[in-house]
Amino acid sequence: FNLEAEGFDRGVHDLFGLEHLEGLAPPFTDRIEIEFIAEDASRWNSFLAGELDFIKVPVSQFDQVLQSREPPALNPDFGDRYHLLANLESGFVHTDFNMDDQRIGYHPDAGQNERNKALRCAIIKAFDWQKRNEVFYYGIGQVFPGIIPPAAPEFDPQQDASSVQRDLQGARSLLEQNGWNADNLPVLEYGFPSSVTERQMFEQFRSFLGDIGYPPGKIRPLTFATYGDYARAYLNREVMMVTTGWTMDYPDAENTVQLFYGPNVSPGSNNANYRNGEFDRLYRSSSSMQASEMRTAIYRNMNRIVIDDCVTISGVSRRLI
């Protein structure tokens, strides 16, 4: 291992204790053990007890750990004992509507199909991304419109952000104009694996929709014992609203737009089971193109198509501490 060849900069990397790797051959450790501890409190307590060497800090502990949010900096008590890494994730969190569910998605009757779209758009307008970011991501996540996250080089900072800005009056108007009312609104089933945090996210979502007159009793949790059970259900198209996170396999918008490509419907990566002829045509035409301004323009157009079809409540890239 040659530190100089790897770009070692003492001014930047001196805190990480890399000098002892000089001249060694990888792997640098005999064993790496990864513990999967689902509950935040248990995972955090194990870390403080010295049972874990590395952890993604639960948001509930940010006030205790951080001296400042921007830029993230450790409180002195933690800074003396631990090293901090703070990065915007190369992905995003989003909630997809299952377009194969006729209560909210595609419907064979053209009129009902349009009413369902209006309902999805109203739900998106009712969603409060500022509160979601503040409560669950400490206000340091980056909210953005659509499905091309900030980590992708094709991300458009000038994209119209109205799809991630709360508009209660606009949501109520959409419902009224399309004949939706408290009596005929469908039951919404919000899926998630059983955990305290996921339940809190559901309750927050239900409160958002309550602000536009959606009856609380018609917004119901669809809980699963494990994430595996949850994944099996949404891959079988059994979940009406699917919340997932996606981490890019490589830094290119192709890796996120494929999440909405028609042939990738469940059990593929298209959890929304979204099908749009123009979107699919653009995906096929761009898949063989090299990175270029033209390809970037195509991806940004595809992003707008998904936004306009109100297929997903998206999104936020979390800042991981």
Regions from the language model: what does each represent?
Residues 1, 142-178, 192-200:
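Structural transition elements
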Residues 1-33, 38-42, 168-169, 173:
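Gly/Pro-rich hinge or "lid" segments in bacterial periplasmic/extracellular proteins
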Residues 25-30, 117, 168, 172-189:
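Immediate post-signal peptide segment of exported/extracytoplasmic ligand-binding proteins
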Residues 29-35, 185-194, 219-222:
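Short, well-ordered beta-strand elements
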Residues 31-36, 51, 102-113, 119-122, ...:
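Second-shell loop/turn segments in exported
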Residues 35-101, 130, 134-136, 143:
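Extracellular/periplasmic solute-recognition and catalytic clefts
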Residues 41-52, 67-69, 203-212, 228-239:
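Short helices/loops that flank or line small-molecule/ion binding pockets
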Residues 79-81, 88, 117-121, 125, ...:
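Extracytoplasmic/peripheral linker and loop segments enriched in polar/acidic and small residues
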